[in-house]
């Protein structure tokens, strides 16, 4: 998402690292607390998207409301507790549910984007089972210490390919090593 000096048709971001880290930590804490997560996540999406700029200088905005998806966010947060239960395979068994919730959030997010106040006719067309596969692969890849970065780079490419409703092709060009050195 960060525009390089040689790229002309990329999204650019004006988000500073300090506020981004602080807001990300706040989302993580509220994910743990469960109840505030719909409001904090929605606020984070609004804050971050407002700092994105399209190649022609248009400003993006996120218009989703917490009350649209509060139950999905809370259920997803509850699923996060599966790792604390002493059943090692429980997070993997919950993968179909967590993937379903994640897919609902992604579809909601994409459908609530605007550019310069105009609604964008975007939708996320990625199917459920591939999303489950990417979610499971992402979970398993964390055991490789560094392999997760390549998985998430490929996952982002898949997600971008599945955004429909624009004449412009959305492409993620990041690589695993670029993901890794930024974390």
Region locations from a protein language model:
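Short, surface-exposed amphipathic charged segments that create phosphate/polyanion-binding patches used
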Residues: 74-77, 139
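Hydrophobic, aromatic-rich membrane-embedded alpha-helical segments
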Residues: 24-44, 81-100, 135-154
């Amino acid at each position: 998402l960060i525009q390089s000096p040689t790229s002309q048709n990329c999204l650019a971001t004006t988000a500073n690292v300090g506020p981004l880290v602080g807001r990300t930590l706040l989302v993580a804490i509220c994910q743990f607390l469960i109840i505030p997560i719909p409001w904090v996540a929605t606020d984070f999406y609004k804050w971050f998207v407002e700092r994105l700029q399209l190649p022609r200088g248009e400003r993006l905005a996120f218009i989703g409301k917490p009350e649209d998806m509060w139950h999905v966010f809370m259920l997803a947060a509850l699923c996060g507790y599966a790792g604390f239960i002493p059943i090692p395979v429980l997070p993997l068994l919950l993968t179909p549910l967590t993937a379903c919730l994640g897919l609902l959030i992604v579809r909601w997010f994409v459908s609530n984007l605007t550019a310069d106040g105009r609604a964008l006719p975007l939708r996320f067309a990625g199917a459920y089972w591939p999303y489950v596969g990417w979610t499971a692969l992402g979970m398993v890849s964390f055991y490789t210490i560094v392999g997760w970065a390549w998985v998430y780079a490929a996952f982002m490419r898949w997600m971008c390919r599945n955004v429909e409703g624009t004449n412009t092709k959305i492409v993620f060009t990041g690589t695993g090593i670029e993901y890794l050195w930024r974390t």
